[in-house]
Amino acid sequence: MSELFAGKYQLKKRLGVGGMAEVWLAELKGPQGFSRQLVIKRILPHLADDDNFITMFEDEARLAARLNHPHAVRVEEFGQAGDVWYLAMEYLDGGDLRHLTRRALTLGENVPIQVLLQMGGDVASALHHAHTLRGAQGQPLNMIHRDVSPHNVLVTTQGQAKLVDFGIARAESNQVKTRTGMVKGKSGYMSPEQALGRT
C-alpha cells in the first residue's frame, strides 16, 4: 500500500518519525519509465498549524538547500501540499552509522579504524563546509549542526558517509532563535560548548 503525496511522490515506506516530522521513502515517476527514489520529510499533522514549527522547518530547508557538499545530504525540493510542509531529499542506499557499528558488534567484529577515520573526516569536511558558508551578501552564516551523532551519519552501500538532519542547526540567518541557555541535541554527543549552552 502506498500513498500519493504532493501529486507526484509515491510514499512507499515510513522510515522514521520524530518530534516534529516523519520521514518516508518515496518514488518519483516520470515519462518513459523514469523513476527515482527520494526521501520525503514532512511536518507531523498535529503541528501543521503551529507557526513556530513551520518557521523552524523553513529554517532547516533554507540551511540544507545551501549545502553543496559530497558528504551532506542534498535537498531536492521544499514545498507545501495542502497544509503539510515537506522536504524532498536524495535517497541514500545504506544505513546510519549507529546501525553499522551495532551490526559489526553483533557479528563479533569491529568496523576497521581506517573506515571510521575516513567517515570522521568526511563528516568533519561537511561540518566545515556548513560552518564556513556565506549568505547572499557575503556575510558568514556561522552554521552549527548541533546534532552530530551516529544516528545522523548515513553510510551508503559504497561506504560514503553523509551528514543528515539539520533540523536543529543554528545559523545567523535563522528566523527562530534558540533562547540563551537552551540546549539542543543528544547529550552523549555534544561538544562542551553546546552542553554549557554556548552555541
PLM regions with names:
Residues 124-143:
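Protein kinase catalytic-loop region centered on the HRD/HxD motif
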Residues 97-111:
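AlphaC helix of the protein kinase catalytic domain
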Residues 82-96, 100:
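Conserved short submotifs of the Hanks-type protein kinase catalytic core
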